[in-house]
Amino acid sequence: MNEYQFVLPYPPSLNTYWRRRGSQYYISDKGQKYRKDVQQIIRQLKLDIFTKSRLRIKVIADVPDSRRRDLDNILKGLLDSLIHAGFAEDDEQFDDIRVIRGVKVPGGRLGIKITELESV
C-alpha cells in the first residue's frame, strides 16, 4: 500500500468552481486556475502516476476565514482537479473519503493524505 501526503491550495467554492450556461455546465475561470495550480503541484511532486488502485483520501481543510462552510463542498473541485492532474484515472476510485476541519489559515490550504488500498 503506497501512501502520498502533500498540501494543496484551498479550492474555490462549488458555486464559483462550476458555471452554467443554459443547460450546460462548465468550469469557471477560478476553477480552471485551481485545476492548473493543482496540476503544477502534482507534476512537481512527480505524482502524476495515473494510479488504477482503489483509494482512501483524508483531507484536513484549513479554512481561509471564519465563515461557516460546508466541508463536503470542497470535494468535487478537489477530486476533479486531482484526476485532471493525472494522479488517478477516475474519481470513482475513491472508496473512503474523510474531510476534517482544521484551523483558520490565511488563504486556506488542504492537507492531503491518499492511500492506495489495493493494486490493480
UniProtKB/Swiss-Prot annotation:
Co-factor(s): Mg(2+)
Domain of life: Viruses
Keyword set includes Metal-binding: yes
Cofactor: how bound: Binds 1 Mg(2+) ion per subunit.
Binding site for Mg(2+): D70, D72, D91
Enzyme Commission number(s) from the entry: 3.1.21.10
Catalytic EC class: hydrolase
GO molecular function: crossover junction DNA endonuclease activity; magnesium ion binding
Keyword Calcium: no
Reactions catalysed: Endonucleolytic cleavage at a junction such as a reciprocal single-stranded crossover between two homologous DNA duplexes (Holliday junction)
Keywords: DNA damage, DNA recombination, DNA repair, Endonuclease, Hydrolase, Magnesium, Metal-binding, Nuclease
Annotated Pfam families: RusA (PF05866)
BP GO terms, sorted: DNA recombination; DNA repair
Assembly notes: Homodimer.
Functional summary from the UniProt entry: Endonuclease that resolves Holliday junction intermediates. Promotes DNA repair. Exhibits sequence and structure-selective cleavage of four-way DNA junctions, where it introduces symmetrical nicks in two strands of the same polarity.
Family under the similarity heading: Belongs to the RusA family.
Protein name: Crossover junction endodeoxyribonuclease rusA
Taxonomic source organism: Enterobacteria phage HK97 (Bacteriophage HK97)
Gene that encodes the chain: rusA
